[in-house]
Amino acid sequence: MSYEHCISGYTNFNENIHYFYQFAYLFTAICINYRILYVIWVSQRHFYRNQSFYNLYSVDCFTSVLAMSNELIFTRSFLYFPQLCVSFSEIVKNSPVFMRIYYCLLSYLIAIKPVIHIFIAVNRMSCVMFPVTYSQNWSQKLRIMLIVIFLAPFLVIWNVLISDNFIGYVNGGFGISYTRRVTWASLSLMQFTLIILTVLITMVTTTVTFYKMTTMKKRIKASERALCIAAALISVGFLLEAITQSFFAFFKEAPWLLDVMNYLRFATMDILFVGSPLVLLLVSDQFRGHVLGSRIGRTQRVSSINNTHSHIHHNTHHTMTRYSYFLWNVNK
């Protein structure tokens, strides 16, 4: 790493290729997250508005869209275009307000994801532990929880907010970092602590969740299993993030880490951003149906809505729906 000028010796084509293949999967993930937001907030709002899990998950999707857009437009453009390093770095260096806003926003978006996941994990546990009162309790307190989610990251990034920023040149490009005003409050150490806390809470809540599911009725167990599995799998991504943050927290001055630190950070970050929506789409047939428009999603949605009617009317309507659906398949 250099703090004075762009590092020469990097092939433009090779570095540009890194950007374009990362653009391919990150832009795809942005589109998927945008589609999920549209389903939860607009097209199927009447179905998801009272489901606290999906309300929390939509916040995660929204922050992921902002973070991935920030990565593509700024972070990785600065890093993977050596031919533009001199001109870009001069513009950024002379824009301290931009550097402050950019770095604070990036740090905030990275810090908020573990906080959201803590609430998602607790949400799944409370669903199986208190199935009768779960929905009402979370609906009443969701607004307070959202306020906590949006404010909690400031406990991690407060030193970033009051510190100065600078440009560091690495891998033919450059990145923006900060000079700690409070020397002991390292951002990497704060993020490592938060992610470790997230992993520990998730392990406890997931264990309790799966244990309680063994005592639940089969119908309820089947409906909740998908979301619980999704929350557990997403936790694996945070475990990988914890390992990466431990390198930055305890070995950041090591010469071997300087050459690979961006690749490590990008790899674990992208696993979380890209993997989270894919996991939920893979394990939940109903949600996948709404997002992708498949027939199973529409069928399950009809069944879910019909559950609000009386038992006799439900049985009659459901039978007619199945019969009409059968005739439609025969005649199509």
Curated annotation (Swiss-Prot):
Where, per UniProt, does this protein localize?
Membrane
GO BP field: sensory perception of chemical stimulus
Q: Name one GO molecular function term.
A: transmembrane signaling receptor activity
Q: How does it sit in the membrane?
A: Multi-pass membrane protein
The cellular component terms of Gene Ontology attached to this UniProt record, alphabetical and capped at eight, are: membrane
Chief place of localization: membrane
Q: Which residues form the signal peptide?
A: none
Per the record, the gene is srg-3
Q: Which keywords has UniProt assigned to this entry?
A: Membrane, Transmembrane, Transmembrane helix
What is the name of the protein in this document?
Serpentine receptor class gamma-3
- According to the record, the segments passing through the membrane are 23-43, 72-92, 101-121, 144-164, 184-204, 231-251, 263-283
Q: Which family does it belong to?
A: Belongs to the nematode receptor-like protein srg family.
What Pfam families is this protein classified in? Answer: Srg
Q: Which InterPro entries match?
A: 7TM_GPCR_serpentine_rcpt_Srg, Nematode_SR-like
The protein's superkingdom reads Eukaryota
Transmembrane helix listed as a keyword: yes
